[in-house]
């Protein structure tokens, strides 16, 4: 079951990325290092509802 998720920057709170994940393989929340355009650097992005 693939669902759409939003990734939000942990430092500024902006929701910068939309992606999909498989809930069966990854039931926990995803954390990825992605580029934040507001801070102009790579930061940790977490899955939000």
UniProtKB/Swiss-Prot annotation:
Gene3D superfamilies, per database record: Ribosomal protein L33
One annotated GO biological process: translation
Keywords, ordered alphabetically: Ribonucleoprotein, Ribosomal protein
One GO MF term: structural constituent of ribosome
UniProt xrefs under InterPro entries: Ribosomal_bL33, Ribosomal_bL33_CS, Ribosomal_bL33_sf, Ribosomal_zn-bd
PROSITE patterns: RIBOSOMAL_L33
Record-linked SUPFAM superfamilies: Zn-binding ribosomal proteins
NCBIfam families documented for this protein: PRK00504.1, PRK00595.1, rpmG_bact
Sequence similarity: Belongs to the bacterial ribosomal protein bL33 family.
Name assigned to this protein: Large ribosomal subunit protein bL33B
């Amino acid at each position: 079951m693939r669902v759409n998720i939003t990734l939000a920057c942990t430092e500024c709170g902006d929701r910068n990325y939309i992606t999909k994940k498989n809930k069966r393989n990854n039931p926990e929340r995803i954390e990825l290092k992605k580029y934040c355009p507001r801070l102009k650097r790579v930061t940790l992005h977490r899955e939000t509802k």
